[in-house]
């Protein structure tokens, strides 16, 4: 971290603490913010004042208070003083002011904070402070145990039924109670930095959430938490304290500056203004003249409008984010800032607020140790000087960061094992018989000493036999330790509430007024709409294409007004127009869902209420609706031959505006209720279906059953369609009466559909739609206010954990005995392997020059990322690949492993002396990716069996394969977790550290000779990192070649490596060689370079090495470390080694395999199908929800269209029956297609890893993915067919039921395969859903229901035959009714003749229809397979 980062950080933390404490009362809160921000200002107050400046101050002092607080003295670049209105200060003024205040952060920040404190102390204003106490805190959760914890199809149903019965007290729940925190008590004191340590699953996050007042309501809590003696219900803890999550949730389209500025504006000025007024009054009374820069800064930071800008700029500088301030934060779809920067944005977002107490959860993930040190040091200065309160959990704090803390809280298995001064924690453990080794970081020791696996190595009482001391025993011993007794005595003394500063605790729910909240949210929504303009333009363009198609299908020259049939075509056209405009609002659903996680976070932090978020998302979409509907109506109205009256033209425009707004509001509401794409799309389909089927067009009002008539009257679509029909058919051109008629043709057409032909129904429709718009938007706001997100981490206990007698937490590997892994390393493995070395000489990797660099004047065609890199990795030697960010560590590893998908590679790479060939190399190598990509719905054991099945040679029988899998599980200590579900990261399943070990094991079961590991310890705490490194070490000791990239390791992790390959920025090596005992060879090499500072005793050699080889050190010393290395004896020895290993040994031969893959095609298919079986069976969110949805829809259709299959005496009866088929095909088909897309998308990321590892070819994978759907869709079609066929009353003959089942089964199938295909040919799920959505619309238009085939213009009829829904509808209708000779009472035709003449359906064509529908399914499945094989959207 740069010096500026540190300073920035400090100030920001300072400001946060200050604000928090002051905001509780009236205004002093703001003081704190001021102090933070003003701090740097104070560092300038040594300036001598000239006479002119004195005169200006005198003039300011004479102003009224309000004006005086809005004017300040600002110094220009020449040093001249000028009076400035704070409201008018611009970007340049703010920038100059900050430049003067924050010069060199590391040097000036503390001075600045002290000066700020002195200014406030000088006039006798007190800083508020908060002491947080928690007493006898117990937190319990309910969890399923063992196999019931797996989310299988049957468990999903059982849990659902059980939960229902439990809620009405019929049957008790089978959940087991799990205690997360066990009777914990303690004090977090102001002015002191407290570090929270503990292994994963120990309850750290739960404790932080409990203290911040943000616990999930589902947890059972006893005990109490107090701030300055006040319980949480007495004030607003969410605004008094800031909880900084370990998860980085931000809106990707906003820049870093905009993200922080929005947060600052929402959290408000707090009490800064009142504090400043009091400060100014006292200074005036005491005739004290403040520093001009500080005064200006404080005034800007307490002025509405200016405050957010000034505070944000300051925080950006302190956090070192000023270099990326105007860069998008980014997400999966948008390239943005790095992970470490994103982590700092998460911290900054809360620190710009006025909270005085900070609860920070793993804020250092992804940061290097120097940046973490800088941030924590700044927080420490702020906390000490400004009386802040901070409890911070860190994963792997380096010794220098650990030493910044005053107090330690050590959690283990829900117990507080130690809480007290840092200096005395080691004394406590020594009193228990455990000592921290000399070269061991104290933080690492503390996290390992309570672990069953690690504890014994620290036992020092050689005269006593060792036994495992449980966390409970430690906690009991701590109570009698002198530190524990002191804390206990303090807790017995109640905090005197009268001593609590009135500004310490906040009682106002929101930081700013209602009008300002609405303004801030509106401005952000407008910004996001501008950033997402492409989406709106794309929607507009898509609507334009559909409009052009629609107007050419319903072309005015083909649209006569001579008969009821003609009226039917107009009705179909108008119905489609309404449906099209309504479905255009569907895009609100994914856009709303996408922003919900950030909304929930900000809502829970009380940034704004739900209505302030909901209103702008409604109002600002109205102009978009105007543009879209305007384009549609102006383009299509006259071309389609609607009534030429201009009044009716504008009435249609108004109506469609309201339809679009109603639909948008409805989909926003559904998104807020559904909260996940799966649930929301299911709800959405359900709501649409009710509207669609009961909208009066598909099923006429007279035919709606009494039990569904309520749905007809509450369907917005009914009012929309009735109004648009009345608007058209009440026109002059429809007033004539046809032969045999008794009323005008227009009225007859409307009445035939069961609608109301009276003109006033247009205005009833308009009024109803306006009412629905208001109702849905209010419901949307209410849903946002009261519903919480679904996807929260789920508590599960494995069978092994349940059976374990240990006191330790069931979720953690350390609870299991297991030294067998270390014993195995000397025995060798069940399966032999050939050791291989890898050498590379003068390797150069380059890519095409990025366009932006070309534009900046670079003339080279290629950008070189690796420059002539050479080295050798040998069997049984563990090599660390290290370097600063941008050094090319991962790039080198990807090049060697053959994982690069682009670029140019030059140089020599050899395997045991033979040139490397990627197809054979993939068979003997493994690559552990940093991202831990695994199928979420299989267990640990199944993941390993699957990998071994596909990657071990064919001659390894099943018994040996299973033995090898067991051995590997033992080696990486996964045996206790064999039945644990892998799960989704951060939601359920394995912890981060367990996933890392699974990644290693998945590669090990392939029995590779060479293994590459990318950052195997990143994101882990010290104890977890030690477990992973032990697994890595065990792997190397079996004689394999292992290379790891590693980021800022602790001393003992670093010294677990045998050799180091150190690179500098620009892709060049600067040290390649052995580490030696206690890194002696490495230290000797660099200390021999003149000017390099010597390492301090006990200092981490890895940290020292990166510090002394930084580019700034190169410049300071005037050397190039690459040149020094290439002139050294070490380099010459390495080149000799490379030459030696580049020659094949006698008696060896080049790698050769008879086939590309380890297993034959059929075995690949079976293995992939086996995994897909478990993935589907354990994914009830997809499989069970789809079946339940289908069952509900079937029951709805059955009751809605009850017995209509037996009535075919009228034209309308046939239309009703067709309508039931059309609606079912469209809705269930689209639901199948949409719901399969996220499933395939998640599995495709796993597929990319497995394919790169050479596990199988793309075709078996695609075959399995296609095949696994068939049984589930068979069940779906059977359930639907039996329910609907019997309830609708179709004719019970074997042939007719078979045809109905056949067409529905293959329709569900081709829709599902179509959804899979769209994912395979597009880069991500979002694009796939957009592409699919376009096709749904076109298929709907050409389905043959809205416009029968004979009425489609000849120039479009060809597409009818290319529309799968048209073929399905043809098959369903022709098979049921195409052979009926019954006469229709309102037609002079039989049913068969009517279907032939009006729809072109022929019963004897069924065989062809069946073949075509099967062909659609086959073509879509085949295209899916080709897409998976041909397209790789992963870029490396």
From Swiss-Prot:
Induction entry: By terpenes such as sclareolide and sclareol, and by some phytohormones such as jasmonic acid (JA) and ethylene. Strongly induced by compatible pathogens such as the fungus B.cinerea, and the bacteria P.syringae pv tabaci, as well as by non pathogenic bacteria such as P.fluorescens, and P.marginalis pv marginalis. Weak induction by incompatible pathogens such as P.syringae pv syringae (at protein level).
GO CC, alphabetical: plasma membrane
Ranges of compositional bias, category Polar residues: 810-821
Annotated positions binding ATP 1: 198-205
UniProt signal peptide: none
Tissue-by-tissue expression: Roots, petals and leaf epidermis, where it is confined to glandular trichomes (at protein level).
Residue ranges of the TM segments: 534-554, 567-587, 622-642, 653-673, 679-699, 707-727, 764-784, 1184-1204, 1214-1234, 1270-1290, 1301-1321, 1327-1347, 1358-1378, 1408-1428
Residues annotated as domain ABC transporter: 165-438, 838-1090
InterPro entries: AAA+_ATPase (IPR003593), ABC2_TM (IPR013525), ABC_trans_N (IPR029481), ABC_transporter-like_ATP-bd (IPR003439), ABCG_dom (IPR043926), ABCG_PDR_1 (IPR034001), ABCG_PDR_2 (IPR034003), P-loop_NTPase (IPR027417)
Domain of life: Eukaryota
Any one Pfam family match given in the protein's UniProt record, by short name: ABC2_membrane
UniProt entry keywords in alphabetical sequence: ATP-binding, Cell membrane, Membrane, Nucleotide-binding, Plant defense, Repeat, Transmembrane, Transmembrane helix, Transport
GO terms, biological process: defense response
PROSITE patterns, alphabetized: ABC_TRANSPORTER_2
Region entry Disordered, spans: 796-826
Gene3D superfamilies with a match to the protein in the record: P-loop containing nucleotide triphosphate hydrolases
Localization per Swiss-Prot or TrEMBL: Cell membrane
Alphabetized GO MF terms: ABC-type transporter activity; ATP binding; ATP hydrolysis activity
Residue positions binding ATP 2: 883-890
Membrane topology of this protein: Multi-pass membrane protein
Family note: Belongs to the ABC transporter superfamily. ABCG family. PDR (TC 3.A.1.205) subfamily.
Role: Excretes secondary metabolites such as terpenes. Involved in both constitutive and jasmonic acid-dependent induced defense. Confers some resistance to sclareol and B.cinerea.
PANTHER family: PLEIOTROPIC DRUG RESISTANCE PROTEIN 1, PLEIOTROPIC DRUG RESISTANCE PROTEIN 1-LIKE ISOFORM X1
Protein name: Pleiotropic drug resistance protein 1
UniProt organism field: Nicotiana plumbaginifolia (Leadwort-leaved tobacco)
Gene name for this UniProt entry: PDR1
